[in-house]
Curated annotation (Swiss-Prot):
GO cellular component terms attached to this protein's record: ribonucleoprotein complex; ribosome
SUPFAM superfamilies assigned to the protein according to its UniProt record, in alphabetical order: Zn-binding ribosomal proteins (SSF57829)
Cofactor section: Zn(2+)
Name of the molecule in the record: Large ribosomal subunit protein eL43
Length: 95
């Protein structure tokens, strides 16, 4: 008898929708259900409330993020750019 592997969250689709689509759904839902750090208190208690809405279970901090991740890669890039711009502006004002 062949070894059985766990199908993950996409096992509910059975043989439908193709292998690649089911794997993508499984990967997305896996990262969505992981523990995420709260940007306010730092605890690993952030959970998804709805599409793009995330809330910390410890401090109750609610914020908007990505649909499947609390912070998207493009959001990280924008935050880094803003910090860099504010850092350069702050240094030039202090001189």
């Amino acid at each position: 008898m062949a070894n059985q592997s766990s199908t993950g969250s996409a096992g509910r689709f059975g043989a439908r929708y193709g292998r690649v689509s089911r794997r993508r759904v499984s990967d997305i839902e896996g990262t969505m259900n992981e523990d995420h750090a709260c940007p306010d208190c730092g605890s690993e208690a952030v959970s998804r409330e709805g599409t793009g809405i995330w809330q910390c279970g410890k401090c109750g901090y609610k914020y908007a993020g990505g649909a499947y991740q609390p912070q998207t890669p493009s959001g990280k890039t924008v935050t880094r750019s803003i910090r860099t711009a504010l850092g350069e502006t702050g240094d030039s004002n202090s001189e």
